[in-house]
A protein has these predicted regions:
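Radical SAM/AdoMet-radical enzyme domain recognition
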Residues: 23, 57-59, 72-159
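Short amphipathic alpha-helices and their capping/turn segments at secondary-structure boundaries
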Residues: 48-49, 97-108, 170-184
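Glycine-rich, proline-tolerant flexible connector loops at the mouths of alpha/beta enzymes
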Residues: 10-13, 60-72
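Conserved C-terminal portion of the radical SAM core fold
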Residues: 58, 63, 137-192
Length: 192
């Protein structure tokens, strides 16, 4: 209904890169001494206008996983701006509860992508040493909460190579299959 036999090009836009997690493999983790930035609404709108002027009709807004630096209100305000410029607005942010996903959808978000990182719960625990991301089940259930909050679509992925890539690829497919059966109206996508 929304996409048909079409292909859309999207571009990512990091609106903030603060993180409160300690993931041993990630360059953005809270212990890495890198330049951190949270764009103002004026900066976000400027970037969106430049991107939209290039002809791109879909944007994926990303934040680091910091609820204190990238509040739901901040992300919602960015979604409202994005809807002025883009047909489709996606988010790749920290996992949220259903109420927050519903709010973001009301603000203009169409879909959410969540990287599970690995579906191997034991390996997951050894890679995520601190922060909200450490809670495996909460991350695993994020896509379903997004759909319950009204999102039109959800994206899935594992970071292949953190654990056995074959098992993670299969687990990702099974995760999609399960939610596709439960929410047949929803759009599902996979990232590599």
């Amino acid at each position: 209904n929304h996409f048909g036999n079409s292909t859309y090009i999207f571009t990512p836009l990091y609106i903030a890169n603060y993180c409160e997690n300690y993931c041993v493999y990630c360059g953005f983790n809270c212990y890495n001494d890198i330049h951190r930035k949270q764009l103002s609404m004026e900066e976000i709108e400027h970037e969106m206008k430049v991107i939209a002027d290039s002809g791109i009709e879909e944007i994926l807004m990303l934040t680091g996983e910091s609820k204190s630096k990238s509040s739901i209100t901040y992300i919602g305000d960015a979604c409202r701006l994005a809807k002025k410029y883009f047909r489709n607005v996606g988010l790749e942010i920290y996992p949220c509860n259903t109420k927050d996903y519903a709010y973001l959808h009301e603000c203009g978000a169409d879909y959410v992508t969540v990287f599970q990182e690995t579906y191997n719960a034991d390996k997951y625990e050894t890679l995520h040493l601190m922060g909200h991301k450490r809670v495996f089940p909460y991350r695993f259930e994020a896509q379903e909460r997004a759909l319950m909050g009204g999102m039109r679509g959800v994206g899935f992925s594992a970071l292949l190579g953190l654990s056995d890539f074959r098992k993670d690829a299969l687990a990702t497919a099974l995760h999609v299959y399960y939610l596709q059966r439960k929410y047949p109206h929803a759009e599902m996508s996979l990232s590599c």
